[in-house]
């Protein structure tokens, strides 16, 4: 019997994202006769209350720990200090390896944190800066919070490397980088796949505009750029006055900042804030929109891109967060002018041009929609993803049993 603990108490506590993945993987693995699985985290919004308490974890014996958030490293660190022959699997949903590899200044600062963390717990400082940034409208404060958060994540990754048994990449770029810089035998590439709820359904289509789905925060999601892009599109095409061009689904610390920005730019009739939507309503919104839009500064994968394509929706995104999903043949999440359109990062001109093209050209949308759906159906399967984790855990448990 292989005993697995899935830890999901970090930065993905809301419905969707890693929390949904972890809970569904837990249910899948629990049906396997050779698996005994427990899950720790906050899943109430998904209709499940975990019976595993943090204080009970350390007394139990698990063969494998699975981490989905870098901020759960302290839990795994303490557990492994108390038990032998434990394999730790880290799923890099936050693209921490990429930040670590390409940010030497942040690595130096993270080492400085290492010198003082025995006296000052960095997690408290991280939480405090997050709260300050969420109450501020200053771009400087938000940028400082973003920088501090990455430094803290890099420090946690340094600590994780001392006991990590397996690194799981969720895009092909991560996998290539991991094989270059990590001294690990177990490096796996297991892409995120959309859940079964995301599919084509019949709806009364009455909206050809864009849909944004995600957190309402500036440091990563860059929603202010999207609002400015819609403003520019409207300004250049007078026939769009009064038209609904963008629907925003999601919640987050910068929500009021974005609403004030929309009001200041006179876009109240063009941009709608729909708030949080549960899966059933979200699938309807995907199926009713013309295209999905993203302006993120970075994405480790971009789950919403594949969710949209599974619903037959093309995607507009920038070249910075369009991740590689396969090397041979070379394929990106979005293939420009095949499954969506890709604009140059931070170019309002290019964004506005491509936004208008997707909004105004129904034939273009139809062609991209057909291709996007075919690509998503052929490339991504939640069953294959879960089966890969099952096989990985069996392999790791076998290696642990054979080690001296």
Locations of the language-model features?
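Nucleotide-activated donor-binding/catalytic signature segment of Leloir-type glycosyltransferases, i.e.
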Residues: 257-277
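Short hydrophobic beta-strand element within catalytic cores of glycosyltransferases
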Residues: 314-324, 334
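Conserved donor-binding/catalytic core segment of Leloir-type glycosyltransferases
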Residues: 202-221, 227-232
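Short alpha-helical donor nucleotide-sugar binding micro-motif in glycosyltransferases
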Residues: 276-277, 284-289
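Acidic anion/phosphate-binding donor-loop and adjacent secondary structure
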Residues: 176-179, 185-208, 281-284, 399
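Membrane-proximal helix-turn-helix segments that form the acceptor-binding/catalytic region
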Residues: 109-167
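Aromatic "clamp/platform" in nucleotide-sugar-dependent glycosyltransferases that forms part
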Residues: 297
């Amino acid at each position: 019997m292989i005993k697995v603990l899935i830890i999901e108490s970090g930065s993905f506590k809301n419905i969707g994202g890693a929390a949904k993945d972890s809970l569904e993987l837990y249910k899948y693995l629990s049906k396997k006769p050779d698996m005994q699985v427990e899950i720790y985290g906050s899943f109430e919004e998904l209709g499940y209350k975990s019976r595993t308490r943090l204080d009970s974890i350390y007394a139990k014996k698990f063969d494998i720990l699975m981490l989905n958030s870098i901020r759960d490293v302290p839990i795994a660190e303490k557990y492994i200090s108390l038990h032998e022959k434990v394999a730790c699997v880290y799923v890099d949903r936050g693209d921490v390896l990429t930040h670590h590899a390409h940010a030497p200044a942040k690595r130096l600062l993270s080492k400085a944190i290492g010198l003082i963390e025995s006296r000052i717990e960095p997690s408290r400082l991280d939480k405090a800066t997050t709260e300050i940034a969420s109450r501020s409208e200053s771009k400087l404060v938000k940028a400082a919070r973003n920088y501090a958060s990455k430094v803290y994540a890099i420090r946690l990754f340094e600590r994780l490397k001392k006991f990590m048994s397996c690194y799981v990449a969720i895009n092909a770029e991560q996998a290539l980088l991991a094989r270059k810089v990590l001294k690990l035998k177990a490096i796996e590439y297991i892409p995120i796949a959309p859940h079964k709820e995301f599919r084509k359904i019949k709806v009364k289509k009455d909206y050809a505009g864009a849909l944004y789905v995600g957190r309402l925060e500036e440091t990563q999601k860059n929603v202010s750029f999207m609002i400015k892009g819609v403003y520019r599109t409207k300004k250049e095409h007078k026939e769009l006055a009064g038209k609904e061009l963008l629907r925003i689904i999601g919640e987050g610390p910068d929500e009021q900042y974005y609403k004030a920005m929309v009001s200041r730019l006179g876009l109240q009739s063009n941009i709608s804030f729909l708030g949080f939507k549960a899966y059933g309503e979200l699938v309807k919104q995907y199926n009713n929109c013309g295209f999905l839009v993203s302006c993120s500064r970075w994405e480790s994968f971009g789950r919403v891109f594949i969710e949209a394509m599974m619903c037959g929706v093309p995607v507009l995104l920038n070249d910075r967060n369009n991740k590689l999903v396969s090397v041979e043949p070379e394929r990106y999440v979005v293939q420009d002018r095949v499954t969506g359109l890709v604009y140059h990062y931070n170019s309002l001109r290019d964004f506005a041009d491509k936004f208008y093209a997707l909004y105004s050209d129904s034939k273009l949308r139809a062609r991209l929609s057909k291709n996007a759906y075919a690509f998503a159906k052929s490339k991504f399967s939640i069953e294959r993803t879960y089966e890969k984790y099952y096989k990985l855990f069996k392999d790791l448990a076998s290696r642990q049993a054979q080690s001296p």
